[in-house]
């Protein structure tokens, strides 16, 4: 958790006050630079810690009368006051794209809007359907009835739309989609307030617009639920077109991107040969048999620069009540200076937090490519290749 004071001290090579996290009392003045260097070094070594920018978060608190934020979820997307909880859900954007033979793919805004309405009502109902860990948690949580509706499958949606993730068009579409979801969610929450009553914190005259929920949108990483939905995670680019997912048991699960398979089949490409090259760690851009227009669209996490990761995150954050969980993927040979610049740039862009991960910085990372093609061979055989 990095404050404005810390970041200012870092910029001017100065000191900042180290505070007791319980009492808030200043303990001592210490230089900011060595602390920041330690954070950067740890992130370079294994991806932890991610950072959040505490004062940026505090300035965007929609209901400060509830209290100051005291905790953040493990992936940085949901900020809460003490004893508060929040219910999250995510819409699969890949399922919100309409694609007809005669027309280019486009966002199905009507379907997306109907899904938002259903999701907001569903998430709000969880307050009555759930059993809370304590009466205090139940009471504090119901003061704001916060929900966090987010998205997943953005990377796959771009594939269907034939838009490169690392493009201004992708940034524009991200902004449009997330802004639309927020507007629709707010409208639904206002309708719910008329039907069922507003949340207690909005009952006061200080709030001109009554809503059922103090906050409505959050973008979580969705690393697990996106597996169930069969789409890319959160607002991340697709990790790889074919890769291995390491399970808790130590076994591996093969993941293949079916949007790429469909386009490769339409182009008459040798899918088994391409996938065998990719599982060995080659990039799509290196394969001469793949047309240039497919290389431009089917970019993966390893192809996206830090700049585009941050641009997409900012586009989403601008229209998200809470925060956006986002990881900047870096190659194995990335150095500490790159991570330092990512953290500084994220702060300057007004992001609420950011995480970086350098490929192979952990011995047993969950997602990877491997020279072992046995799982791919079995998959190709099972699918008739």
What do these predicted regions represent?
Residues 17-25, 93-110, 132-142, 159, ...:
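Glycine- and acidic
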Residues 1-6, 53-63, 136-147, 171-177, ...:
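A glycine-rich phosphate-binding loop feature that marks nucleotide/adenosyl-phosphate handling sites
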Residues 1-61, 65-67, 90, 98-103, ...:
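Conserved, charged catalytic cores of large soluble enzymes
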Residues 43-141, 153-157, 231, 236-258, ...:
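Function-dense linear segments that define catalytic or interfacial modules
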Residues 22-23, 115-138, 142, 161-222, ...:
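Internal maturation/activation junctions in enzymes
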